[in-house]
Amino acid sequence: MANILIQGATVLTMEGPDGVYRDGEIAIAGNSILSVGPRGSVPEGFRPGRSIDGTGMVAMPGFVNCHTHAAMTLLRSYADDMPLMKWLSEKIWPVEERLQPEDIYWGTMLCCLEMIKSGTTTFADMYFSMERVAAAVEESGMRACLSRGMIGVGSGARKAIDESLSFVREWNGGADGRITAMFGPHAPYTCPPEYLKKVVDLAAREGAGIHIHVAETRDEIEQIRAGYGTTPVRYLDAAGVFELPVLAAHCVHLDEGDIEILSAKRVGIAHCPESNMKLASGIAPVTELLQAGAAVGLGTDGAASNNNLDMLEEMRSASLLHKVSTGDPLALPSFEALRMATAGGALALGLKDVGLLKPGMKADLILVDFRRPHLCPQHDLIAHLVYAAQSADVDTVIINGKVVMEKRQVLNLDEEKIMAEAQKRALRLVNRE
C-alpha cells in the first residue's frame, strides 16, 4: 500500500468548528493518517508513493452511515407511501422470504457502490445471509459494522442465534480489520426477554456489541406497554442489553427517563430522519438527546424506506427537520449535523479510530469538489456541506489508506455489472413465486 500525500485542499478535521487548514496537507502512511496540517507540515523523510492535488477541494472524514439494511437496495421503490407495520407485514417481509444469498450479495454491492459515490466510508448494517454481505464489503473496500437480524419468536429464533454466533466468530475483525461483527436482535417487540438475555450472554462472551431497533413507532410503544407495562428503553435496560456496547436505531418515541437511561448507559443512537419522515414514524428528540450527552449519529435506514443512501441529504434533512419541528432556527446547527454524520457517527458505532482527520486515525477520508456553482461563493464551508453540497460533488474517496474512488470513478467495482445484476435480481425477486 503506497503512502499518499494530499496537498492544496482545505482540510476539515472535525475536531471542532475551527479545525480547518485552508491550504492543507495530509500525509497517509499505510492505512493510517501520519500528519495533518498546513502546507509544509509533513514530517521530514516522508516519501509518498503518490500525490493528490486537492486544489479546490475540501478534505474531510468520510461519512458514517449508522443504520441501514444494505441489500434492501433491491426493494427501492417497491413499496412506498405506507405506514411501517403495514409496509413490513404486507410488502417487505413476504418478499424478503424469497431472497437468496446471491440476491443479498448483489444488493449489498449496489449499496456499497452508491455509498462510495456519495462519500460514505463506514456503515452499520442489519440483515441476513451476512456472510455474503461481508464478502461484498470486503470486495468493495468499505468499513462496516455488520449484524445478522434476529427475530426471537417463531421457528427461526434458534437458527438466528446459531447463525449470528457463527458470523461473529468468523468475521469480527475481518477484511483487514474493516469489519466489526455484532449481534442484531431486531427490536423489543420481536424479541422476548428470555431471548434478549440469551443474546446478551452470547455478546458478552464474544466481546461483541448489539445493533437493535428501538422505539421506532407509537405502535411499538403501545405493544411493549401492553405486554410489559414499560417503555421499550426500560424493557431493554431490564434485560441487561445496555450493559454492552449498543447501537440503537431510530429512538423516536422517548420520554425523559428513556433519554436519561440512553445517555447514562452510553448507548449509541442512529437518527434516521428521512426514513422516519417517509414512514410517518415521528421525530426523534435529537436536541434533547444531545443536550443529555448521548452519542447520536445519522443513518439512512434501508433504500426501501428512504429511498437513497445519501448522507449529504440526510444531514440537510436532519438539520432542517429539527429547526421547523422545534421552531428554533438554532436547533441542530450545521456543524452539529456534520459532526453527527462523521465523528458522532463513529462514536455511536464504538469506532475510536475513524471520524476525525488527525494523526493515528484510520485514513478514511473524502475530497469534495467545491468548484461548483451551487457552492459559490464560499463564506462558510461547513454550511455549504450541510445545506448545499450534493453527492455528485464527492470527487475522491479513500478508505483504510486505499483510493477507492478517484475523479468520480470507483476503481475496484464494476458499476455497470453491479447495476445490471441488481436490476435483474430485483425484477426476479418481486415476480418470484
UniProtKB/Swiss-Prot annotation:
Membrane-spanning parts: none
Q: What is its EC number?
A: 3.5.4.28, 3.5.4.31
Which species is the source of this protein?
A: Pelotomaculum thermopropionicum (strain DSM 13744 / JCM 10971 / SI)
This chain belongs to which protein, by name? 5-methylthioadenosine/S-adenosylhomocysteine deaminase
- Kindly give the Pfam families that the UniProt entry links to this protein: Amidohydro_1
Write the gene name.
mtaD
The free-text note explaining how the cofactor binds reads: Binds 1 zinc ion per subunit.
What the entry lists under CDD domains is as follows: ATZ_TRZ_like (cd01298)
User: Which annotated residues bind substrate?
Assistant: 96, 148, 158, 186, 216, 301
Protein role: Catalyzes the deamination of 5-methylthioadenosine and S-adenosyl-L-homocysteine into 5-methylthioinosine and S-inosyl-L-homocysteine, respectively. Is also able to deaminate adenosine.
Positions of Zn(2+) binding = 67, 69, 213, 301
Task: Supply one GO molecular-function term.
Answer: 5'-methylthioadenosine deaminase activity
Cofactor(s) the record lists: Zn(2+)
Question: Which InterPro entries does the entry mention?
Answer: Amidohydro-rel, Deaminase_MtaD/DadD, Metal-dep_hydrolase_composite, Metal_Hydrolase, MTA/SAH_deaminase
Which family, according to UniProt? Belongs to the metallo-dependent hydrolases superfamily. MTA/SAH deaminase family.
